[in-house]
Amino acid sequence: MLGEVLAEVTRSEVVESVHAGHLVLLNADGSILFQKGDPTLNIYSRSSLKSIQASAMVRAGLDIEPRLLALVCASHAGTPVHQQGALAILAKAGLGEHSLKCVLDRPLDEELRRTAEPTRLAMNCSGKHAGMLATCVINGWPTDTYLEPTHPLQLAIKAEVESMSGETVALTSVDGCGAPLFLFSLLGLARAVRNLTISADPVHQAVAQACRDFPEMVSGPGRLATRMMQNVPGLFMKDGAEAVNVASLPDGRTLAIKISDGNQRAMSAITTAALKRFGVDAHEAAINTLGGGLPVGTIRASF
């Protein structure tokens, strides 16, 4: 799992720590431009796969406005706007928060987190779960078992994942939110999202464009995926737990990253360096390490 060093943490020009992992960059034609580590390694893509899950829902009949479709693809911050959006998806299907089977959580904002009671709407995957439930209602599928791997919805999602990645799911586990989680390669993740962004299928076009048009719904103010999509025209990006990230440009150039220790602190630097290899400026500020409250080093990509 370790892979190769992707980022270094420096202090007074000395490398104090490193983050290793796996990285693959695809050319517009789908060939590999650059790699570090082993992109054929099977990983759990976590929430970086939500656009493919959402595609399966739209294909099965989910019909909601683009802003809410972006929320179905989201790992959101639990702001009032995000929670209201998830509730709107449920309400359109005649459901309420009680139907959600994601875990309880608080908003990510520190002030809100101190005062808010845990709810399912505040959980960062509530948009996805609301979309899943709405898709079940449209198709007359059971809503109480929508997270079971053998449920028609989850079988449809798995089929979409395998079709888009070109791989067979090696193992089905359970994600942090309770939804089925699929094991396949980092390269398969890159190919799946590349296929999404270059697809002529109206389903895929709708999902990708919703995220590009409403990046604030996909993550939240100041967060990596939101700010990079805001700063790079046409970019699609989705990160996931345990330090996974995938990003794709409209012409099909795509990157996928897995940091082996699961720590996200170097993700901005690594993603910025990867985009630079495509000739794209992510407009990201350097991340400093501090000594006595002052910058004494930086977190930088090692490639």
Predicted stretch roles:
Residues 1-40:
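Beta-lactamase-like hydrolase cores
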Residues 19, 34-52, 67-70:
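Short active-site loop at a secondary-structure junction
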Residues 67-169, 195:
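Active-site-adjacent helix/loop patches that line small-molecule binding or acyl-intermediate pockets
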Residues 197-303:
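Structured C-terminal helix/loop/strand segments within mature extracytoplasmic catalytic/sensor domains
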